[in-house]
């Protein structure tokens, strides 16, 4: 029965996906994090994670697999397994992205061509210094509390698995007390109100300024409230995934 097989596959994918996501709250030295993914359907293609590497370092990562279902969930599982087994390389975002790229390429078949956008940040939780790399994902935004300005961590790079040959770069990041970094997928930017007007990148930046709170969970709730007001009771048009990181 094709219908029963379909339901069983969805259940497997859901279980796999739920096992990949971290607890929503994370704290380490000067940093507080909160992450949440809201799917428009039973299964989303978004992936987020953050975890401690050693006594001072931690990583933040976010991905978006093209498509949904079992295939997307398995790609996420492979990515997490690959990252967790990377040891000392966890401090080098571009090495991690290159390894994931090779993994996605190797997992492709003629029937199923998977592509995954991905971003990776390694942070020193004491100094506030880090390294960031991006593979086709939305550029994170940094809210500088001292100036009230929102900056973009802009770094180009193709999606994982999109091309056989790929070069991934990394850039330094330095955060001060009161700063916040917001990772997001394009679901928030492309959300439309009842007249069809998108929030857009400028709208999102304004939303981040107006929503700021040193507690990342409260910051997220403030952003989500403004998003809900914008769509005006309509159903979500896409998955909505955020990681918010604040520096004490």
Language model: regions and residue ranges:
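… and, occasionally, acidic/histidine-rich disordered N-termini of signaling adaptors
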Residues: 2-181, 229-248
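Short, flexible active-site loop motifs that bind/organize anionic cofactors or intermediates
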Residues: 86, 194, 209-210
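A short, conserved beta-to-alpha structural element at the edge of catalytic cores
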Residues: 96, 100, 208-224
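Cytochrome P450 core scaffold surrounding the K-helix E-X-X-R motif
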Residues: 142-145, 192-198
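Short acidic/polar inter-strand loop motif in beta-rich domains
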Residues: 188-190
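Divalent-cation-assisted or electrostatically stabilized phosphate/pyrophosphate-binding catalytic cores
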Residues: 197-209
């Amino acid at each position: 029965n094709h219908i029963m097989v379909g339901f069983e596959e969805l259940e497997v994918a859901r279980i796999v996906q739920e096992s990949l996501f971290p607890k929503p709250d994370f704290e380490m030295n000067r940093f507080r994090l909160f992450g949440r993914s809201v799917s428009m359907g039973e299964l989303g293609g978004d992936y987020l994670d953050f975890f401690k590497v050693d006594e001072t370092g931690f990583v933040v990562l976010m991905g978006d697999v093209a498509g949904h279902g079992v295939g997307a969930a398995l790609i996420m599982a492979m990515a997490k397994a690959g990252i967790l087994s990377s040891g000392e390389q966890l401090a080098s975002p571009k090495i991690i992205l290159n390894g994931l790229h090779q993994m996605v390429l190797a997992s492709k078949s003629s029937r199923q061509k998977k592509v995954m956008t991905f971003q990776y940040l390694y942070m020193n939780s004491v100094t506030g210094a880090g390294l960031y790399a991006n593979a086709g994902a939305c550029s994170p935004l940094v809210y500088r509390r001292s100036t009230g300005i929102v900056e973009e961590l802009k770094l180009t790079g193709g999606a994982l698995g999109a091309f056989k040959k790929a070069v991934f770069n990394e850039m330094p990041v330095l955060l001060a007390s009161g700063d916040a970094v917001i990772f997001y997928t394009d679901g928030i930017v492309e959300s439309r109100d009842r007249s069809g007007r998108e929030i857009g990148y400028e709208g999102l930046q304004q939303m981040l300024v107006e929503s700021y709170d040193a507690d990342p969970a409260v910051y997220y709730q403030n952003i989500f409230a403004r998003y809900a007001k914008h769509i005006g009771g309509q159903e979500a048009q896409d998955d909505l995934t955020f990681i918010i990181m604040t520096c004490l």
